[in-house]
């Protein structure tokens, strides 16, 4: 492996960040498949109602599961003040640009490996921009540059300008019948931009026999215009990280300020929802405020409990996910582990039924991935970019 790969451990880390990131990845790579398998095995209205928490909303609104991706972006931003401060103090700018470029390229390629069909080796089915890691690549690149080269006040101005710029574009630009305040799946400006810029390289797009590009009617995520607000999601984490790193405030007060700011942002986002709807698939500006507010409140809670009160009982296992988040994500999306438990446990299916057998397979895969990550954690091997 190249340098990018596995590196040994390192300076002191913010424990609450590792554990919160670990919780996020546990839900994504450890629990999601198990819960959806259970939804096919367990009958009853109460359990099916519970599954709303593990399902993305179709379009308008926000569910707990919709927070998983914004939290991932937010936490990448929290780390920026801890990892990039030396570049503000005169460290090599050449090294900074090399480091940011390397991180951007690797995250972009990892995203294509996970969701861009790069491993399919079929040029006609490669998707260019379609994955969470790529949104982090874009958001982190610009958030880090803003952090190094501008003041915190300027960064707030930039974040507001990006939010308002996205909103203004969606409201006032009309092209080919798209946009002009239209937030429907088939009529919004971000949809038109993705179709026009990505074309055949948009996720789920195919070229028909006549040579025309057809876009899947079920795929509604947008990426090009949404890159503006991806940057703000990462910047929101950077603001939280600057507060946490500051030595001018007592730790308990930092937690309180984070929580209050989170409440304000979420409240403003829901108020904005009346004019500029909260739509996660479009990454609207109101959704960024809502999700960033929730992220601030979660960060406040975890920071207070773990780093202020030093309570970690029953939580440290999450660091196995949190300190190898990219490895956990890629293992889950790039490798089909189901063949391993299926090869060993297929004899159970006639006895427990197909629905419960799917639960066994999902749980076995989750345990296998955790075991791999635990072995890496014990060996102090971490996938770095």
PLM region descriptions:
Residues 1-385:
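Alpha-helical transmembrane segments and their immediate juxtamembrane cytosolic regions
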